[in-house]
Amino acid sequence: LPDLEKTTKNFADFGLIWEPRDIVGGDCYWSIKFEKKIWFGLFDCTGHGVPGAFVSLILLSRLMRSFQEAQNDSERLPSKLLNNLDTTLRESLGQNNSSGLRDDGADGSIIQWELGSSKIVFAGANMPILIQKGGKLSEIKGVRRSLGYRRSKSLSEFKDIAIKINKKSRLFIFTDGVTDEGRELDGLAFGRKRLIDFLSKHEKSSLSSLNQLLKDELDDWRKKKPKRDDITFVSMQPL
């Protein structure tokens, strides 16, 4: 995973919850700065524990190689990186034919922005982004398609979405372990609406404070019930 201290310096404010269900897991994040631009990606790989961590290591390796081999700006766009990752992850996992026993992959998203710019570029693979701006919280969904799975090979390509932001805008991306977290009493999932209401309620909090509040909220929701999944929640305020 990227050096968190270096990653934090690329943002006006930054917060992270990263909690594998086991000692290691399938949630992973990626960030890089290149020529006054920042990229940040979050991925939710198949499985938990060692199997999930194995897929995440392959994914991060292929993503970094794709970025390093890019010849120009267009090849570093989030959609292009996701399209390449879909292909190379499937190849690395041996899932180009229908006879294999494995069918692993990931959901994910990549954000790109130029320092000081008033827009970001987002592409999502079955993972949305939440934008908080001017007292309003909006959800922008990615393509309904995952990365690497056999079944995703024939689906439409990923698309870049340009999103206007300002210096006070806040961006949130998260794995489904956050919204799927089960309540101790009856197993009810925490849910997307409850998360959005929580973020709206705490829009004045710093992102580090917000993430601690969310962690406490999820812990209180779950109580002594074991985690269902790996949990990752990323909050960002671009410079």
What do these predicted regions represent?
Residues 1-170, 225-239:
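… and, occasionally, acidic/histidine-rich disordered N-termini of signaling adaptors
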